[in-house]
Regions:
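Structural/interface elements that position substrates and couple domains in central-metabolism enzymes
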Residues: 1-176
């Protein structure tokens, strides 16, 4: 609800542009928000290839001072052990030249705008304190329910996994009743 009107308004004001060239978009942005699916393989393992491709595109356009925010469901430690080294390698920048945080998406189907604006507090955890504070500042502008900074990206990733587990257990329990 309200998404078509919001998009139309932002486009007409010149505040929203679209491109089919991800590297161009990465080069023009200073805040990069990654929300991609994480499919499961035949071996019941997360397939992170989509995330890897997006991170590579962002890395090619990453500039000092940029902030990368990962929102998709990933195994704990993915941000620190997979995304951070990939961004450093592709961009040629050192860890302290850009920000990186995990900020789990917390939306329900059909309610995305309402949820993003403040149905739930936003959890944020960076690879360092500066990244956590930068993510916090961004999401405080967007989320009326506030921001919950956690100790690090791995903790934020675990929050996302446990929220999904909680939901799945409740659905399973309801199906058994």
């Amino acid at each position: 609800p309200d998404l078509p009107e919001l998009v139309s308004s932002l486009v007409s004001k010149g505040n929203l542009e679209a491109t089919t060239e991800p590297r161009e978009a990465a080069a023009r942005a200073s805040i990069h928000v990654v929300i991609v699916p994480t499919p499961i393989t035949d071996k019941n393992e997360p397939d992170l290839s989509i995330l890897d491709a997006v991170v590579e595109d962002i890395g090619r356009g990453l500039d000092p001072g940029d902030l990368v925010l990962i929102e998709c469901t990933v195994p704990p430690q993915t941000t620190e052990r997979r995304v951070l080294p990939a961004l450093e390698e592709v961009s040629g920048l050192s860890r302290d030249a850009f920000g990186l945080a995990f900020c789990p998406e917390r939306t329900s189907s059909g309610r995305a705008l309402k949820d993003i604006r403040g149905a739930y507090p936003k959890v944020v955890g960076g690879v360092d304190d500066e990244s956590t504070q930068a993510a916090r500042a961004i999401y405080e502008e967007l989320n009326s329910e506030g921001v919950l900074p956690v100790s690090d990206a791995t903790t934020a990733e675990a929050v996302k996994v446990f929220e999904g587990l909680y939901r799945d257990v409740n659905i399973g329990l309801a199906n058994e009743l």
